[in-house]
Structures are given as C-alpha cells and as structure tokens.
Amino acid sequence: MASLTKKLVNGKPYYYLRECKRVNGKPKIVRTVYLGSAESIEERLLRPKAEEISMREFGGSVAAYSIAETLDVVATVDRHVPKRGHQGPSVGQYLLLAALNRCVAPTSKSQIGAWYKKSVLARLLPLTANQLTSQRFWDNMERVSSDQIAAIEQELAHTAVTRFGLELNCLLFDATNFFTFLDSFNNRAKLPQRGHAKQGHDNLRLLGLAVLATTDGDVPLMHHTYAGNQHDSVMFHSVVDQLFARCRALSEEVDQITLVFDKGNNSEVNLDLVEQGPLHFVGSLVPTQHEDLMAIQREQMRRLDRSQLPAVWAYRTEKKVFGRNRTVLVTFNQQLFNAQRKTLNREINKRKRKLEKLQDKLQRTRPEDRGKKPTVDGVEKNVKEILRGRHMKDLFSAQVIKTQEGLPRLRFQFREDEYQKLKSTFMGKTILFTDHGPDWTDEQIVLAYRAQHHVEADFRRLKDPRYLSFRPTFHWTDQKLRVHAFYCVLALMILNLLRRKLAQSGIVLSVVEMMNQLTEINEVTLLYPAPQRSKKPVVQTQLSKMNDLQKKVASVLGLDRFLHN
C-alpha cells in the first residue's frame, strides 16, 4: 500500500510517496517517489491545461542528421567551398539541408521552407525564412564546381569507409538515367539530351547518372553525371581513371578490390584500360555474340553449392575475349529460366491473338465492300509491328499473299523448332568473364556478379517518389544539375548507412519501411502558463507515442539525445 510521507530538509518539509510490502514476513519500503514541496505539489495539481501544443517531425530528420554528423558533412563541404563573410549559413549547411530534405520528404526548393518549419531541423539547423528561398539555395549551389564536388565526395566516402568500417573487396559500377522537364530550346544545359529513357518518356531530355557502390550496405562511394544520349561504353571510358583514383584513395589494398560492371560497358579499349588498372573485374558478355558458349547444355555443367546458389549450374572455360584470354563462366539458373519462359509464352500468345484477329479480318474482306481496301504493303507493315519485340520474328513465319481479286490474305505459322532451340540455348543462361583465375571459384564469380542488385536497388530508391527521389529537379543548367545529383547521392549514402546500422543491430528494414517508421516519431512541445512568482512559461517536450519497433529503432540510434530539454 502507498502512503504519503513528510521529510524535513534544512527545516523545510518535502513529501514522498512510499510503497511498503512485507518481505520475508517483515515490512519493507519497495518504492519511493519524490513529490516535492507542498507548493510544487499544489502548482502541479492546479496547473491549467497547456496553452499551446506544437508538433514537429522528429525521427526521420534526426536519424539522418546523426549520420550526417558522423560523416562531418558541413565541415567537409566548407573546407572545399569556404564561407563568404561571417554572416548567414554556409554552403555546407545549405547542401546538408538539401540532402536531408531528400532523405525525409523530397520537395522543390520553393517548398523546402514549409517542410523545414514542420521538422525538428528548424531547431538543429536554425535558419530564417529569408535564408530558405529558392534564390538563396541557387546562389550557394552556384559556388560549387565539378572539381569541388569530386573532392568533397571523395573525402565523405573516405570518412564513411573508416568510421563505418565498410568492406571494399567487391565494388559495383552501373548507370541509369532520369528524365527532366528542360525545354527543348534550353541551350544552356548540355547534359540533358534525348535518348533511351529507362523509365519511359523518350520524348523528354535525359540526365545520365553512374554510381560506384559497395556490396556492404549499398553505400555509394562515387557518382558521375553524363549526357543522357551517351552510350554506357563511352561513359565508362571517360570515367575509368576516376574510378581507379577513387579506389586508390579509399583503400591501401586496391589490388584486392574486384570491380563488377555490366555488358553495356564492354569494348576492347575499355577492357584494355581495366587491364592496365589496379583492380580485378567481373563482367558479362552479350549472348548473341557467343553462340558457341550458349550451345553448352546444362548436362555439361557443374551444379554449384546449393546453400549459396540453389538451382544454378556453371561451365567454366577460357576464351579470348576483347583481345585477351579470360576465365569464362556459362551459367544456367533454373529460376531465371522459369521466369523467362513464362514471359516468352505470354508474349507469344499475345502475338498469336493479334495475328489471328488480323487474319480473320482480312478473310472477311470482299471486293464489293465499301471503303478503302487493305493493301499488301499495309498488311506487311501491320505484321511487322505485331512481331516487334525480342525473338518474335524468329518464332513466327508470316506471309502476305494477294488473291485473284487483288485482296491481301495472311498466312502465319508458329515455329516450334525455333522455340525449342531458344529454350535449349539462350533461356536461363548468362555468360560471365573475369581476370580472376584459379584463385576464384565458380561460386565466387557468380556471387560477385549477382551483387549488382545492390547498385540496382540504389537506382530504384532514387526513382521512388517517397524518399530519396531524384525528382523534382527544377534546375536548368549543367552546373546546378551536377550539384543536385551530388546531394541526392549524398542522401542515398546517409540513408543506406542508417539502414546498415540498424541491420547490424538485428533490425532489417528497407529504406521505405525504415523511414515510414522514423517519420511517424514526432517531437511534441506543450507550453503552459508561467507559474506563480515566475515570468517564464513552462515548456514540456516529449516524443509522441511509439510502437515497439519504433522504440527499438530509437534506442539503437540514440535519438533521445536530440530531444529538446
């Protein structure tokens, strides 16, 4: 039972709530709660309701901010782009805020002020409304050159490697592009060009982005922006020296690093450059250029370790590739085969239905019918359009003939022999090549190439509108597009390091799941009237109610240290 107890301290009474229980037959005080003086108890009991309650987003902002603190983002940027004068925010503060906005709630520069006011960053990075205009951001972005971006990123990457202990034994290089809304007549920007858009929108100008990332946490260590109409192999040739320099700057054992890249980067010149560099490599080859290798059947292959690579077989050999003898691995993946067969069958059935519909329509056409009659040329163009797509022209034989009345008729046949040939040669197979010899097993080669999914996941994150989104860009010059790309990749580094930190503590979440949980944690501030004999109002700050997962995440990240006292 609890009871109220008075205790005199220096002649003044103070009150405690004490709970007493019998322990081994004897009364014992098991809990004591200090209540204070009679005046303070009265004040709390009679305190009016809060005059003002405010709430700011807390979890996502401070979690990303804590990683940025560890990376020393502001100081690093400011070392390379010194502040002008002594007043106002530095370039480092502007770029950090832009990156944190990308982490938490991607928006345009004109909307960043409204987001900022609702975030706890308004307390951690205090700025005025006048300092958060689009023009102030653009003015500070204007000061950052391409060389400075590269130097800043290299220093941040080195900090990430050393302070977070990133593994560098296998690094991944890949490229993608993003569509922009730059006007066709904007001649100031040369980077955005029309090309093959990986998100569709071929009518829009594209900006290319290449990234070097770790397999350990998908952390980007370098990026490169390039013209949207530039082929990957041309881009790779222009950036390979930077790749080598970045790896040398990050590791003293650069000869132990294996670089993984896709077949789009292949060329004899590029492979010569890689051969002359310090890195090992694993890449892939275009299947249609090596039909002798694709003819190898699964029965000739060795089944790989089932615990690491279930349902994967491989045939290892040597072949002269791009002018040099290389270790070559032909792999067969049963899961890939099943998926490709399912997709191919769907496309085949779609073409069959279209050809049958066209055939039936032509069959019902009569000389006496009114209107414009179909022509052989027109039908052939229609058939050609129907059979667009990979393998379709090989799988169907189609012939347009003319009747005695001059009307076109369609005859077509599905080529079962070509279908079986396709299944036995191309489907489910991949050709890998590497400069590694007997020092690497088949399993190591396959697992290294498969690790490409890490950098592909990074690109998906940059194209997700919820967090990290590369869009909206709303920049119209190459220089500002480069700076925009820099802080987007910086945001990607921050959130991937954050996700990796949680995973190391047993909390495995995607970026979206992680940020959904974190951004629901709010800082709630309650403002009470000033008590008697005081002019200052009472301010109480606490976090909003958290679920079990949020409590665990907040504990691992130590978020309570950012709570306003």
What are these regions (language model features)?
Residues 3-6, 12-16, 24-28, 78-565:
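Anion-binding and metal-coordination hotspots
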